[in-house]
């Protein structure tokens, strides 16, 4: 026979010749009969009998007889009489001199006639799966003499099927007979050995290798493959035969499986009139993922059933531990086939199971803790307890889990209700003791409180009534000018200020008759419309650096830090980390707008080197308003950016964590000592550059005939260095200075970089506020402190580079006074005080 032409687009269903070729040749056995003829002949025999119930044994005998007649000598093979080669399992002949027993299903259920009703599906295994070892008997599970005699007699008479070869009864080894004959015998006599009499004889195991006994506890075996309908009784189910012969896809069976499982869940039992349940009350230990079901039969549970039906029982684990059957690796099942299983066990039977089923996937169910069910509230408490550091003792952990009191941690912090971290009283006192002099906390707190007092009137729910106007008259015109300017700032930040659902910014106060001022801000997020461009304002944090320099920072969205005034925290620095003092833990919008304007004003003023280019501060506010309104009298755009001056941009730098006690004592003190030396070194370098420039100018003027020989020399650096500040991680060194003209700092920065090997930054102080003459020249506290220290040390020791590189070593000698005794020049916070005084006089 010539094969039809096959190409890449050819399919069995489209090409008739190719389909016939596969059906006629490839699916034929040695007798010349095709596998597809077997179900058809079985149906013909069933139709001819005229009975509603199909007997698979009768159909099998007829088919075997027909195969024998045309088998060309196949009847001479003894195995055809004893073995169903399609079903793989032999049908047992009746034992002589013994009363005929009703048909016994291999699962152990007595049945008068084989049932064709489809009840449920079970995953089948392949013949390549390992066989489990036979159970080891103990004193409590011995067979009696009659049972053992019947077992030996049937063992000798049963044919063996191992792999792909047949073995005779007389020439087989005992080990080969133990694998299959013993399991078939025990499956047939399963009821007699697993009754309620207390016998613990192990039930036979499935060919997949499931153990049938563990720790003297009975284990139900996997079901043998069962036919789903009469057509499949004479063959073993496979994917190819189901698809090509029966035209049934596996998905259809899986769908039918789910329907049967729903019937079981509703308590529907198809076998109450067919099976005897007297022996189905014993409890068995089942394999993980295969729950208990009756006596030796498991229902087709999916692996995502409801977990935690019962806790694990360990009452009998210590008895007869030597009888445990070795656990073999399970093979993943691939094909569902029908089985004659009774209904699902009741809820009480499921609660008695000693083994918990496998946890479901992607299902939110209550979990268990120490064998007890845990509700949602307890689960949250357990999750909170897992985040508590291990350094806490058990008493604190118990208080945290019960939401009673606070937990004091070893690092000085306090865990509040298992959620938030804050500084303890002891740690907060340490912060105040170490940071009061270095960060000028007293002056910073006083300045901030005064600003908040002036802005408090604007936050009032009342308009300018008699009471508030009296307060303005009492304090002078400062409040009035500041409040008017605050309205300008709020008008420039409408995305943060106005409520989109209000009329022109007028918001009612709890339904009362009193209204807020025009342009007032509400923090109620529920009043905002999500479809517009209005942004909710998140309160910022106001912090102070050395000498009281103010900074606005943001906090992470999911932060658990509860900050207080006076705390020392670690923040994001310039490509590093820095240590700052918390001034205001939560800054409202008015204070944020005002501080942001002051910082931008100081920044633009510091860039102006010539004092004649500055605008008068008492006229600056009005000129800013005119520039905003587009009038003729306006600010020079080359000197001031009006938009940057008035608009608030949320800072990207954030507060990271609280500072540790070591950081605020040892590390901060070492940082202060390095800053004292850096100030001295910078002034020495500056003096050396100026002296070199002066001597060079003198030599050039004497050697040349030009009247102005200084034009050929480098100009002298006309600056005054006030202070030095290291970033906390020592990745940046900033020098603050005051100058009256434009200078070239490249030589100075080059010399400083050679010494410190870090980034050097020179920051100017505005020269229109007379800060140096008012707050520095007369006192110079930091410079005098260093000069007193120099008297006790040699200049070579102070100028040694190796000393700076080892300044954080354990052998470092501290020469500066303690942090709680130092007094510095608070010129940074003085810049803000002088600017506010001149702007709003």
Curated annotation (Swiss-Prot):
Phosphothreonine: residues carrying this PTM: 334
Keyword Cell wall biogenesis/degradation appears in the UniProt entry: no
Residue ranges constituting the PSP1 C-terminal domain according to the UniProt record: 653-765
Region (Disordered): 33-57, 118-147, 202-233, 290-324, 337-369, 384-405
Family: Belongs to the PSP1 family.
Reported function: DNA polymerase alpha mutation suppressor.
Protein name from the UniProt record: Protein PSP1
Organism, scientific name: Saccharomyces cerevisiae (strain ATCC 204508 / S288c) (Baker's yeast)
Lineage per the UniProt record: Eukaryota, Fungi, Dikarya, Ascomycota, Saccharomycotina
């Amino acid at each position: 026979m010539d094969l039809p032409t096959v190409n890449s687009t050819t399919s069995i269903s489209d090409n008739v010749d190719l389909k016939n070729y596969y059906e006629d040749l490839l699916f034929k056995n040695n007798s010349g009969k095709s596998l597809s003829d077997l179900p058809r002949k079985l149906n013909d025999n069933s139709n001819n009998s005229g009975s509603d119930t199909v007997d698979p044994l009768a159909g099998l005998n007829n088919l075997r007889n027909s195969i024998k007649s045309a088998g060309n000598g196949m009847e001479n093979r003894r195995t055809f009489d004893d073995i169903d080669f399609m079903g793989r399992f032999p049908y047992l002949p009746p034992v002589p001199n013994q009363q005929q027993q009703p048909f016994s299903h291999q699962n152990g259920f007595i049945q008068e006639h084989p049932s064709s009703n489809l009840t449920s599906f079970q995953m089948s295994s392949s013949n390549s799966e390992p066989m489990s070892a036979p159970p080891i008997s103990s004193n409590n599970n011995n067979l009696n003499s009659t049972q053992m005699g019947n077992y030996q007699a049937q063992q000798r008479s049963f044919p063996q099927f191992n792999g792909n070869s047949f073995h005779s009864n007389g020439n087989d080894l005992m080990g080969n007979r133990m694998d299959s004959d013993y399991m078939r015998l025990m499956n047939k006599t399963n009821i007699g050995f697993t009754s309620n009499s207390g016998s613990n004889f192990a039930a036979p195991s499935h060919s997949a290798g499931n153990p049938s006994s563990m720790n003297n506890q009975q284990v139900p075996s996997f079901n043998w493959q069962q036919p789903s309908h009469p057509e499949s009784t004479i063959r073993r189910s496979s994917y190819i035969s189901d698809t090509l012969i029966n035209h049934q896809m596996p998905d259809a069976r899986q769908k039918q499986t789910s329907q049967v499982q729903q019937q079981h869940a509703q308590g529907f039992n198809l076998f109450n009139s067919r099976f005897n349940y007297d022996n189905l009350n014993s409890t068995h230990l089942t394999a993980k993922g295969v729950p208990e079901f009756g006596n030796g039969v498991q229902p087709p549970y999916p692996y995502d059933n409801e977990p935690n039906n019962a806790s694990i029982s360990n009452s009998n684990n210590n008895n007869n531990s030597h009888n445990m059957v070795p656990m073999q690796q399970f093979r993943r099942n691939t094909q569902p086939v029908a089985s004659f299983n009774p209904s699902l066990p009741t809820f009480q039977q499921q609660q008695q199971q000693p083994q918990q089923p496998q946890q479901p996937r992607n299902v939110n169910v209550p979990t268990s803790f120490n064998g007890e069910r845990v509700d949602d509230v307890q689960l949250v408490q357990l999750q909170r307890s897992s985040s508590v550091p291990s350094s806490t003792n058990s008493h604190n952990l118990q208080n945290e889990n019960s939401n009673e009191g606070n937990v004091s941690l070893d690092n000085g912090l306090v865990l509040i209700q298992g959620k938030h971290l804050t500084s303890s009283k002891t740690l907060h006192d340490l912060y105040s003791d170490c940071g009061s002099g270095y960060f000028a906390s007293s002056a910073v707190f006083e300045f901030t409180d005064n600003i908040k007092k002036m802005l408090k009137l604007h936050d009032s729910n009342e308009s300018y009534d008699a009471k508030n106007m009296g307060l303005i008259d009492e304090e002078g015109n400062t409040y009035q000018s500041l409040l008017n300017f605050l309205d300008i700032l709020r008008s420039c930040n409408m995305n943060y200020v106005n409520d989109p659902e209000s009329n022109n910014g007028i918001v009612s106060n709890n339904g009362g008759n009193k209204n807020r001022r025009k342009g007032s801000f509400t923090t109620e997020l529920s009043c905002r419309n999500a479809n517009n461009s209005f942004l909710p304002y998140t309160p910022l944090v106001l912090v102070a650096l050395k000498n009281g320099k103010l900074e606005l920072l943001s906090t992470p969205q999911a932060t658990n830090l509860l900050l207080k005034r006076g705390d020392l925290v670690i923040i994001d620095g310039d490509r590093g980390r820095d240590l700052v003092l918390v001034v205001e833990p939560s800054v409202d919008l008015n204070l944020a707008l005002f501080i942001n304007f002051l910082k931008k004003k100081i920044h633009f003023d510091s860039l102006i080197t010539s004092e004649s280019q500055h605008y008068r501060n008492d006229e600056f506010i009005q000129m800013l308003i005119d520039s905003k309104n587009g009038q003729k009298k306006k600010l020079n755009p080359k000197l001031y950016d009006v938009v940057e001056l008035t608009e608030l941009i949320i800072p990207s730098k954030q507060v990271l964590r609280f500072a540790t006690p070591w950081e605020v004592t040892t590390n901060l003190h070492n940082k202060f000592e390095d800053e004292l030396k850096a100030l001295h070194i910078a002034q020495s370098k500056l003096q050396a550059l100026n002296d070199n420039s002066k001597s060079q100018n003198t030599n050039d003027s004497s050697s040349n005939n030009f009247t102005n020989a200084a034009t050929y020399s480098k100009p002298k650096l006309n600056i005054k260095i006030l202070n030095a500040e290291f970033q906390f991680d020592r990745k940046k060194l900033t020098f603050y200075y005051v100058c009256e003209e434009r200078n070239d700092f490249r030589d100075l920065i080059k010399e400083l970089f050679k010494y410190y090997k870090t980034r050097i930054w020179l920051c100017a102080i505005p020269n229109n506020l007379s800060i140096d003459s008012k707050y520095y020249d007369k006192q110079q506290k930091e410079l005098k402190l260093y000069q007193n220290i120099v008297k006790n040390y040699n200049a070579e020791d102070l100028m040694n580079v190796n000393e700076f590189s080892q300044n954080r070593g354990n052998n470092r000698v501290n020469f500066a006074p303690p942090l709680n005794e130092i007094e510095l020049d608070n010129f940074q916070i003085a810049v803000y005080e002088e600017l506010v005084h001149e702007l709003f006089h």
